């Protein structure tokens, strides 16, 4: 699911590990991820996806404008999931619904799947629309959640890429910020009020590296 970068970065090492044991073909849908997969993608679909806004929420108008339900239904029919023994989906709706349509066993392996688990803490007030999406966006025969606490046997820690594990971190004098739902300008305006603090911002909306006062900005590219 190319709505954001998390789905893509999680998939890289998982796919490489799976390929040690079985044949794996890759399908992506959506087009709002800056991180690129380091291997061939067999199927590239539009799917259904939301778009990041710049004021702390989803860009609703663009999400409505750029999604086409009829195209989505056609993609479900065209993706040949019937040729596969299993479908694994990280909150990717085309393969999930195609597998259901073709009676192919499917596994949901995602952060969103964790939200279906009774042991995962929930907010006191849950939007009915949000709950409807979580429950029905990507149907599956089995759900395994990626969560930051090992609360039961169906929850797993999110995978960390090998390239990240091999880095040698240092204790710098700055704080790291990643807020993809906000514009770079809005983040800068807020952080620059803390004049004696250094900030490193990774931004979905930046196209090059630059510094502005006590804030250094880096684009997302890997």
Residues of each region from the PLM?
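Conserved nucleotide-sugar donor-binding subdomain of glycosyltransferases
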Residues: 57-86, 93-94
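Short loop/helix-cap segments at secondary-structure boundaries that form the rim of catalytic
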Residues: 32-39, 96-101, 137, 147-155, ...
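An aromatic- and histidine-rich active-site surface loop
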Residues: 11, 87-102
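Short internal beta-strands
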Residues: 24-31, 146, 199-204
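Conserved nucleotide-sugar phosphate-binding/catalytic loop shared by glycosyltransferases and other
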Residues: 2, 24-71
């Amino acid at each position: 699911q190319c709505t954001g970068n998390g789905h893509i970065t999680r998939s890289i090492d998982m796919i490489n590990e799976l390929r040690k044991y079985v044949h794996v073909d890759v399908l992506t849908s959506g087009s709002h991820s800056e991180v690129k997969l380091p291997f061939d993608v067999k199927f590239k679909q539009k799917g259904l996806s939301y778009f990041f806004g710049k004021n702390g929420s989803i860009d609703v108008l663009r999400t409505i404008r750029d999604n086409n339900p009829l195209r989505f239904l056609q993609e479900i029919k065209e993706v040949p999931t019937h040729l596969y023994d299993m479908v694994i989906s990280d909150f990717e709706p085309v393969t999930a619904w195609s597998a259901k349509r073709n009676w192919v066993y499917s596994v949901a392996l995602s952060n969103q799947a964790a939200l279906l688990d009774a042991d995962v803490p929930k907010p006191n007030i849950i939007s009915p629309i949000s709950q409807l999406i979580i429950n029905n966006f990507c149907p599956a025969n089995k759900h395994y959640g990626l969560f930051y606490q090992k609360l039961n046997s169906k929850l797993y820690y999110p995978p960390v890429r090998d390239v990240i594990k091999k880095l040698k971190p240092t204790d710098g004098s700055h704080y790291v910020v990643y807020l993809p739902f906000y514009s770079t300008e809005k983040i800068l305006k807020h952080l620059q009020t803390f004049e004696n603090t250094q900030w490193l911002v990774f931004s979905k909306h930046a196209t090059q590296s630059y510094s502005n006062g006590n804030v250094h900005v880096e684009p997302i590219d890997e």
